[in-house]
Amino acid sequence: MFNIGINGSMYVGALYAGWAGYRFTDLGHYSHVTLCIAIGMFVGAAWMLLPALLRVYAGVSEIISTIILNFVAVLFVSYMANGPFRADPIAPATPRILETAELKQIFPNSQFNTGFFIAVFVAILAHFVLNKTTFGYELRSGGDGLVGMYPSRFSSYLGIPSDRSAIIGMLLSGALGGLAGAIEVLGAVRYFFQELEFNQGFDGILI
């Protein structure tokens, strides 16, 4: 499977991580940051549920559906930043997140923050899970088994439910996109605004 919708997951993950960053006011630093990241990952994963189900059960190309959802995500977060979550009467933006929700800066006057170490840790963990565990093998087999319009029988011959593995894989990739968006808001810009742009999802395809 090819998930081209990471940008969409990043947008919605960033929006709701930013929302959680100012909405919850009675939390300590680590609790608040953890909650914001968890919400961003959950929303990012949920954003990928529809294209995953369409791919597995209806044979709809996940490339087409996730690209479309990228545009839907841009329109959705634009509406939310201009409407329900808007705080600034001049600029379409959410309120600034609370200090308890901020990822700490490594260097003064720099956007380099502890989110970098979170990203490195998650990348190492993902590599280990995908290549060194049974769960990771099932994920790779399930994704590779989606050939043509419908899942091939290769995975089922191995006793691996390819449809379930494919859905879980899409949700996990969406969660990682939501994590990336959350780190951007919590560690760099400190609030969500309409003009915030994410191109890292497409950059990740090349990497």
Name the predicted role of every residue range.
Residues 1-24, 37, 41-60:
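Single transmembrane alpha-helix segments in multi-pass membrane proteins
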Residues 5, 28-34, 103-115, 194:
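Interfacial loop-to-helix junctions that mark the boundaries of transmembrane helices
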Residues 7, 186-207:
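Glycine-rich helix-loop "coupling/hinge" segments at transmembrane-helix boundaries
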Residues 8-12, 34-42, 64, 113-120, ...:
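Hydrophobic alpha-helical transmembrane segments
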Residues 14, 18, 41-46, 70-81, ...:
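Hydrophobic core segments of alpha-helical transmembrane domains in multi-pass membrane transport
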Residues 25-30, 55-58, 82-91:
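A cytosolic-side transmembrane-helix exit/cap motif
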Residues 62-132:
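Transmembrane helix-bundle core of multi-pass membrane transporters
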Residues 107-191:
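Helix-loop-helix "hairpin" substructures at the membrane interface of multi-pass membrane proteins
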